[in-house]
Amino acid sequence: MAVVTRRFATGGMHCRSCSMLIEMEVGELSGVQSVTSDHAQGLTVVSYDEAATSPDQIVGAITKAGYAAELVQD
């Protein structure tokens, strides 16, 4: 199991409730260890097992919650 941490630029969040919705949706993905979303910074940080989940799946979960998302390349 290789756990990685990736950052996702997340647009459209206005308050802590928005962040919580994203955290719940992404947290349901297989392999996700932790997720923290910050509406003030427009950023979601996810630690996950890259054998179980992909950045595209995380972007999809954020989009499903109603927000725009893009992987931030380090």
Positions of PLM-derived features:
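Flexible metal-binding regulatory segments at protein termini and peripheral loops
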Residues: M1-D74
